């Protein structure tokens, strides 16, 4: 195992597919292994911990190797043409199994194989097989890495809202919560076959919403408004009024919005902690409902645009 002397604060390594499982029409579970994963780790719960995966270029099949990754690896990687280096995307660590050199990382990948959302991750996952190789960038034990946004205050009432792209994150969080936590999770998926078995605290209700032919996010919006029981129901958002990099947490705002140093008290929803992730337009609408209309304090919310309809995902 490496020491903390002269090593990168992140783990950059080649990994190999150990197994592939089709969980549902829209989800593929891939288990990744490498001896270097012995150095993977975070201090405390992983919750919605993010990592990076580099996929082969779908046209050429080329993929850069992590090799002896040094501090300039990312810069060197970016300088190469995409058709040679591969494509980097962000995923949630769904689970970690084993220990030492036998450590494996589980990632659930959404299959967007039609329309304008086809990407290198979906393309790769649809045909992935044991022995296939990727490059992984993840937390190294003993170093700050970031990538965990779920951070409720002690005793907060949870509200978790997700579309299919955030299902791995919600499920990972639910399985790591203290058994005394209470709240509600609303999860929208494309089909009834995408409803997965997830175990969380008995005090957290989990509602799966099947989109079917409904507009993207409509069932989520209606469920959240109904759950909160207050405020107007109309949260229509114009396409040109959406931050393509929407990412707002109690400590960060992608829009540069000033984040209050102190939180308001005495509000009807004081004690709520909302974690909302998915398509940026849907997330923007829900953000307006909670923050603008219901006046939920910014310290109580995390809004994350995991993707934007009609826009190619970036690394």
How would you label these PLM feature ranges?
Residues 1-315:
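Extended, composition-driven regions rather than compact fold-specific motifs
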């Amino acid at each position: 195992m490496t020491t903390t002397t002269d090593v990168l604060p992140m783990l950059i390594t080649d990994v190999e597919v150990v197994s592939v499982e089709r969980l549902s029409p829209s989800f593929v579970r891939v288990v990744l292994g490498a001896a270097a994963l012995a150095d993977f780790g975070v201090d405390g719960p992983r919750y919605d911990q993010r990592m990076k995966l580099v996929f082969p270029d779908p046209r050429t099949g080329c993929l850069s190797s992590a090799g002896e990754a040094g501090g300039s690896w990312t810069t060197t990687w970016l300088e190469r043409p995409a058709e040679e280096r591969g494509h980097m995307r962000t995923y949630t660590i769904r689970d970690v199994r084993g220990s030492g050199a036998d450590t494996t990382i589980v990632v659930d990948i959404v299959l967007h194989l039609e329309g304008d959302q086809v990407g290198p991750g979906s393309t790769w996952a649809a045909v992935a097989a044991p022995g296939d190789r990727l490059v992984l960038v993840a937390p190294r034990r003993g170093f700050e890495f970031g990538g965990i946004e779920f951070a409720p205050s002690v005793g907060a009432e949870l509200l978790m809202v997700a579309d299919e792209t955030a299902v791995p994150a919600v499920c990972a969080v639910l399985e790591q919560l203290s058994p005394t936590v209470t709240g509600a999770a609303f999860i929208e998926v494309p089909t009834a076959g995408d409803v997965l078995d997830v175990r969380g605290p008995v005090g957290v209700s989990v509602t799966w919403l099947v989109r079917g032919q409904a507009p993207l996010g409509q069932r989520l919006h209606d469920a959240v408004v109904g759950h909160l029981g207050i405020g107007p129901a109309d949260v229509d958002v114009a396409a040109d009024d959406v931050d393509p990099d929407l990412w707002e947490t109690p400590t960060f705002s992608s829009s540069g919005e000033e984040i209050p140093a102190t939180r308001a008290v005495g509000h009807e929803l004081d004690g709520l902690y909302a974690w909302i992730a998915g398509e940026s337009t849907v997330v923007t609408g829900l953000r307006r409902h909670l923050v603008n209309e219901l006046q939920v304090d910014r310290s109580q919310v995390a809004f994350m645009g995991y993707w934007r309809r009609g826009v190619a995902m970036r690394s």
